């Protein structure tokens, strides 16, 4: 496969790097099998503790130098990274699709997200601003400013094997931080490919060795990072269970954690909805990336007046979906990441049936020619209740639950009535409904949309959610502040020393 050669991916690959050179290691060997066809793409040698220490030590040394570079100069490096990513967009996007299983256009879109966040970060490098405040004391000035934090540990998930790392890294770098990346063991080759691209830019521009570390491996690497006091911030994307474990360990040492965890996202379909928009938003939201996005639409809350009509339209919309090799751009749905994910899908289907769910679009595992990997499943739709245990749980698969509501208050209560709080949406032409949904009494999610679906976030906005989603924010807006330490400054430019609150202390 030519795209692998272009990305310098071979049958066996080193998986530990300081950002400038590869590090010898004797850790776990990670084998990457494509869910597309079941073929072994390549292996990656993970980190042992010695290799881990090499990367962390280099990161510490690099931070001492990198933080002194002017922020716009750091931004220039990120700009060059973005230019290099543009050169390899097709090849890297193809690898994302082949190793993870998402459609080719989604793979290309993920690399475009990387490029977009580079562009955003370049502008940000000239806007890392604080605030100036008036002091109550005469002849004094107050302001706050932001300083680089240190090493940022990034633990990423398989479903977005490169974009989420870029969200964190590009912002961290312009903020003056250095990064250490532990990619998902299910998609290690995407990380190796990114590192190859980054190394080229960093070597040409004399970026300190250690600014961009890679530490491939299994759970033990994530545990080392979480417990490491030399890493002041750990950004972790994954399941709620994983996030709770990371958050507890990081919190025990009073470090910072940025957690991007599960979602159980819903679309409210109003009686005044544009049905065409609603159908497209619902179907793409539910089946895109084979239901493996954090923002995948998992629930439709449909007004009772249009429930039967909408249900019929929804079933008809599912009928022409093409399932198959995601490198074929005619396909709508690719495979799940692995056979464990297929097992989870089947278990969720059975659980839904046991609780009383009625499947109006039938589930199943596809077999035969072109489905040899065993990872292809049918997107399905079930009538269910919000109270079902399985509905309260996030299943990373294309399973969509639909249910009725009578009033907007009831719909919002159903939307909020799950442990997770990532993304939400309402499809309506009623201004009052839309504004209520967006108000303090509306959606309790970190993302709340009107007349678009729950997935497909742009990098300009902060991305993240509440409750068991973790509370972290990545990407745009002012998410950069989590990567820096805040400092308040008071300057006295007189020959006197008045105290605040009118206190006197005479000597």
Where are these regions (language model features)?
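ALDH superfamily catalytic-core signature
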Residues: 200, 241-386, 413, 450, ...
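Rossmann-like NAD(P) dinucleotide-binding subdomain of oxidoreductase/dehydrogenase enzymes
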Residues: 130-277, 405
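Hydrophobic face of amphipathic alpha-helices that form TPR/SEL1-like repeat modules
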Residues: 1-37, 364
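Conserved C-terminal structural/oligomerization subdomain of aldehyde/semialdehyde dehydrogenase
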Residues: 37-43, 206-207, 231, 268, ...
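Glycine-rich loop-to-alpha-helix module at the N-terminal edge of alpha/beta enzyme cores
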Residues: 39-128, 139
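Residue-level signal for inorganic ion chemistry
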Residues: 38, 74, 96, 118, ...
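Residues at or immediately preceding the N-termini of alpha-helices
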Residues: 35, 49-52, 71, 89, ...
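A structural signal for short, well-ordered beta-strand elements
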Residues: 31, 45, 67-68, 100, ...
């Amino acid at each position: 496969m030519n795209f692998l050669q272009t990305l310098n991916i071979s049958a066996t690959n080193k998986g530990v790097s300081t950002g400038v050179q590869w590090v010898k290691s004797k850790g776990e060997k990670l084998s990457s099998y494509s869910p597309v066809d079941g073929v072994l793409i390549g292996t990656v040698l993970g980190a042992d503790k010695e290799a881990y220490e090499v990367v962390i030590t280099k990161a510490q040394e690099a931070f001492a130098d990198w933080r002194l570079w002017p922020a716009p100069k750091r931004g220039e490096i990120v700009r060059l990274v973005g230019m290099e990513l543009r050169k390899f967009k097709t090849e890297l996007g193809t690898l994302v699709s082949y190793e993870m299983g998402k459609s080719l256009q989604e793979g290309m879109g993920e690399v475009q997200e990387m490029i977009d966040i580079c562009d955003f970060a370049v502008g940000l490098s000239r806007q890392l601003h604080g605030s100036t405040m008036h002091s109550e004391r005469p002849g004094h000035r107050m302001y706050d400013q932001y300083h680089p934090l240190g090493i940022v540990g990034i633990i990423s998930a398989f479903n977005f094997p490169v974009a989420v790392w870029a969200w964190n890294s590009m912002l961290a770098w312009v903020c003056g931080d250095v990064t250490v990346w532990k990619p998902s063991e299910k998609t290690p080759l995407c990380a190796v490919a990114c590192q190859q691209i980054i190394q080229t830019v960093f070597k040409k521009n004399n970026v300190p060795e250690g600014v961009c570390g890679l530490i491939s491996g299994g759970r033990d690497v994530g545990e080392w990072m979480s417990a490491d006091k030399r890493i002041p911030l750990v950004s972790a994307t994954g399941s709620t269970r994983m996030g709770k474990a990371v958050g507890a360990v990081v919190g025990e040492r009073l470090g910072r954690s940025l957690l991007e965890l599960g979602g159980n996202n819903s679309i409210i379909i109003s009686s005044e909805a544009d049905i065409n928009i609603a159908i497209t938003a619902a179907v793409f939201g539910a089946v895109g990336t084979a239901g493996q996005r954090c923002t995948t639409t998992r629930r439709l809350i449909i007004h009772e007046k249009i429930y039967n009509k909408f249900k019929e339209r929804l079933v008809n919309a599912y009928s022409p979906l093409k399932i198959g090799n995601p490198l074929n751009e005619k396909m709508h749905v690719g495979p799940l990441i692995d056979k464990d994910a297929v097992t989870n899908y089947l278990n969720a289907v059975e659980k839904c049936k046991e609780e009383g769910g009625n499947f109006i679009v039938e589930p199943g595992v596809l077999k035969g020619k072109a489905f040899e990997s065993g990872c292809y499943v049918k997107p399905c739709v079930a009538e269910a209740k919000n109270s079902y245990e399985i509905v309260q749980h996030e299943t990373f698969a294309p399973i969509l639950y639909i249910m009725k509501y009578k009033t907007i208050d009831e719909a919002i209560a159903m939307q909020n009535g799950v442990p997770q709080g990532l993304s939400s949406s309402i499809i309506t032409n009623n201004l009052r409904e839309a504004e209520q949904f967006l108000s303090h009494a509306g959606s309790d999610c970190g993302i709340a949309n009107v007349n678009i679906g729950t997935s497909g976030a742009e990098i300009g906005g902060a991305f993240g959610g509440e409750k068991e989603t973790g509370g972290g924010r990545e990407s745009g807006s002012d998410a950069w502040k989590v990567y820096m330490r805040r400092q308040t400054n008071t300057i006295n430019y007189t020959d006197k020393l008045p105290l605040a609150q009118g206190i006197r202390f005479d000597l």
